[in-house]
C-alpha cells in the first residue's frame, strides 16, 4: 500500500465512487491486453528489502523515521512498525550479471542504512522474525506515525469489530489476543519481482504456485516468535492471522483471508484474478483519482491504474499479481512475498536466483499444470514447507519426495537451465545456486536458529538465548557469509554486555498451579 495519501472509506457514496474507479481500471487493463499494449520483453527482475532496526542489546529500536531522514534516499521508505524500513531496489534486465549487480546494489544501500543507524545508536538486521521481539514492542506506540498506517489499522479493526486472535501451534503453542495490526510488523521479507510475458501470464502464475512449497522449504528463516518455537517459517501463519479482516466467529463462513495462497488454479486472465480479489475483499481505504483510465487509453496514454493498485495493496497473496508502468510502458509482474529477510544478502540473492531460474526454466511437461495436478496438493506443499522447512515431504507429480531429493535432483538442474537460457553468467549461476545446494546438506536459517536455541536453552533463559542468537546473526551478516557456512554458537562466541541484562534473563516464566494441601 505505497500510496501515502489514503483515507478510510466513510459512507456508501465513497464506496460507490471507489468501486467505479476499480471497475474502470479493470476495463482499462482488459483493453490494454486486447490491444497488445503490455510489454513482453525484455524481462526484468526487482526486489524489496525489509529490515529491522535494533539497539545495542538487539531489541527493536523505535527510531525508523530519524534514520530515514538521515539516509535521505528515495529508495528507502517506511513500514507500519517504527523499527522497520524498506528498500526498493532498481529493476534490472534478466541477463548476464544482473544478480551480482543486484547484490552490489543492495549491499551499497544497506551500508548507507548502517551508517545512518550508527548515528542514531542503532543497528540494522536482516531476519524473517526478530528473535528478541516481545509483546511490548508491538503496541500502537511503536506504529510509524504516518496517516496511512493509522487509517489501515482502523479500517481493518472496524471490519472485524473485535481483537485479533493469533493461534499458532508448532513445537510450542502461541495463543494471544491483540488490539492492532502491529503483529504484522513482526515479519520482514525479501520480496522478489519477475516481469512476465502477458501471453503466458496465467500458466506462469500457476507454475509459481506449484514451486512455492519447495522454494519456501530451502529459504525458511523464521522459527521463533515471542520465545516460542513454532513453524520453520512462522511468518506464513502470523501474517495470515495478523491482518485478517474476518471476525473470529465467522472464519468458517468465508473461503479465504486477505493473506492467502488461493484455493484454485487460475484459468482465465490476470484481469480475472484482480476481479476475483475485488469481489471477494471489500475496499478498506481510498485516495484521490485524477484521471479516468479508460479515457486515457482512448487518448493514447498509459494509465497507472491507481485504484486497482491501492486495492491490490490490501490483498496479500503469497504470489501476488502486479501491474506497473516503467518508462511509459505497462508491464505485468509476479511478486513473491513468502521469502523471508536474511540470513544474509548472499542468501537472499541465492533465494531469488533459485526462484527466478525455476520460473523461466519450466520444462514443457509442466505447461498447463492446472490440467495435470490437484491444486490441493500444491497448497498442502506450501503450508507443509512453512511448518517443516527442509523436513517436508512433498507431493510432486503425484508421488511423495523429500525436499532434499526434489531440490538436488530436479529443481536445481531446472534453475540452471532456465538461467542459462537468459544468458546469466555461468560464474554467477554457480556462485548463488551453490549456496542453495550447500544448505541441503547443512542448515537453512530456520534450522540454524532452532539448533542454537535448543542448545542455549539448556543453560540460559529463553530471552537471553534469543539475544545471543540475534547478536551472532548480526555479526555473521556483517561478513555476508551464507548460512550454510555458519557454525553453531560456542561459549567463546557469547559476549553480551551485562548492562543489557534484564530481570527476564534470570526469571522463570513457567506457571505452576499449587493447592494449599500439596506438599512442596
Which residues fall in each region the model found?
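Phosphate/nucleotide-binding catalytic core
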Residues: 1-520
Amino acid at each position: 500500500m505505497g500510496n501515502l495519501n489514503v483515507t478510510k472509506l466513510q459512507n456508501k457514496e465513497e464506496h460507490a465512487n471507489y468501486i467505479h474507479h476499480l471497475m474502470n481500471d479493470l476495463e482499462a487493463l482488459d483493453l490494454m491486453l486486447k490491444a497488445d499494449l503490455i510489454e513482453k520483453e525484455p524481462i526484468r527482475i526487482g526486489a524489496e528489502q525489509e529490515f529491522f532496526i535494533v539497539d545495542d542489546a538487539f531489541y527493536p529500536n523505535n527510531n525508523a523515521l530519524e534514520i530515514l531522514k538521515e539516509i535521505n534516499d528515495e529508495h528507502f521508505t517506511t513500514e507500519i512498525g517504527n523499527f522497520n524500513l524498506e528498500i526498493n531496489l532498481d529493476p534490472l534486465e534478466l541477463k548476464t550479471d544482473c544478480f551480482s549487480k543486484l547484490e552490489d546494489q543492495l549491499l551499497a544501500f544497506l551500508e548507507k542504512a548502517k551508517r545512518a543507524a550508527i548515528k542514531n545508536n542503532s543497528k540494522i538486521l536482516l531476519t524473517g522474525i526478530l528473535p528478541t521481539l516481545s509483546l511490548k514492542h508491538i503496541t500502537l506506540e511503536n506504529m510509524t506515525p504516518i496517516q496511512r498506517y493509522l487509517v489501515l489499522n482502523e479500517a481493518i479493526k472496524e471490519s472485524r469489530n473485535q481483537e485479533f486472535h493469533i493461534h499458532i501451534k508448532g513445537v510450542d503453542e502461541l495463543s494471544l489476543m491483540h488490539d492492532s495490526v502491529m503483529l504484522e510488523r513482526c515479519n520482514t521479507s525479501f520480496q522478489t519481482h519477475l516481469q512476465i510475458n502477458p501471453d503466458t501470464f496465467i500458466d506462469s502464475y500457476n507454475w509459481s504456485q506449484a514451486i512455492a512449497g519447495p522454494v519456501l522449504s530451502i529459504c525458511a528463516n523464521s522459527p521463533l516468535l515471542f520465545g516460542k518455537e513454532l513453524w520453520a517459517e512462522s511468518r506464513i501463519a502470523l501474517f495470515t492471522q495478523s491482518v485478517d479482516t474476518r471476525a473470529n466467529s465467522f472464519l468458517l463462513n468465508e473461503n479465504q483471508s486477505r493473506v492467502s495462497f488461493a484455493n484454485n488454479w487460475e484459468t482465465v486472465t490476470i484481469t480475472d484474478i484482480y476481479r476475483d480479489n475485488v469481489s471477494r475483499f471489500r475496499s478498506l481505504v481510498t485516495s484521490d483519482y485524477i484521471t479516468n483510465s479508460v479515457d486515457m487509453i482512448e487518448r493514447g496514454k498509459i494509465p497507472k491504474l491507481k485504484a486497482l493498485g491501492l486495492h491490490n495493496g490490501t490483498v496479500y497473496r503469497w504470489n501476488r499479481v502486479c501491474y506497473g508502468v516503467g518508462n511509459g510502458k505497462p508491464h505485468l509482474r509476479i511478486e513473491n512475498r513468502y521469502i523471508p529477510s536474511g540470513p544474509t544478502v548472499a542468501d537472499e540473492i541465492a533465494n531469488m536466483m533459485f526462484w527466478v531460474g525455476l520460473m523461466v526454466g519450466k520444462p514443457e511437461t509442466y505447461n498447463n499444470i492446472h490440467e495435470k495436478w490437484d491444486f490441493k496438493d500444491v497448497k498442502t506443499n506450501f503450508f507443509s514447507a512453512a511448518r517443516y522447512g527442509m523436513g517436508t515431504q512433498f507431493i510432486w507429480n503425484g508421488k511423495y519426495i523429500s525436499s532434499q531429493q526434489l531440490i538436488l535432483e530436479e529443481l536445481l538442474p531446472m534453475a540452471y537451465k532456465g538461467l542459462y537460457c537468459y544468458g546469466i553468467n555461468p560464474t554467477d549461476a554457480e556462485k548463488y545456486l551453490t549456496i542453495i545446494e550447500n544448505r541441503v546438506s547443512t542448515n537453512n536459517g530456520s534450522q540454524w536458529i532452532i539448533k542454537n536455541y535448543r542448545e542455549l536453552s539448556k543453560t540460559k533463559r529463553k530471552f537471553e538465548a534469543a539475544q545471543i542468537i540475534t547478536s551472532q546473526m548480526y555479526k555473521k551478516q556483517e561478513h555476508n557469509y551464507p548460512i550454510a557456512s555458519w557454525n553453531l554458537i560456542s561459549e567463546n562466541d557469547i559476549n553480551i554486555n551485562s548492562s543489557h541484562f534484564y530481570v527476564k534473563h534470570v526469571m522463570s516464566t513457567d506457571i505452576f498451579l499449587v493447592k494449599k494441601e500439596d506438599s512442596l
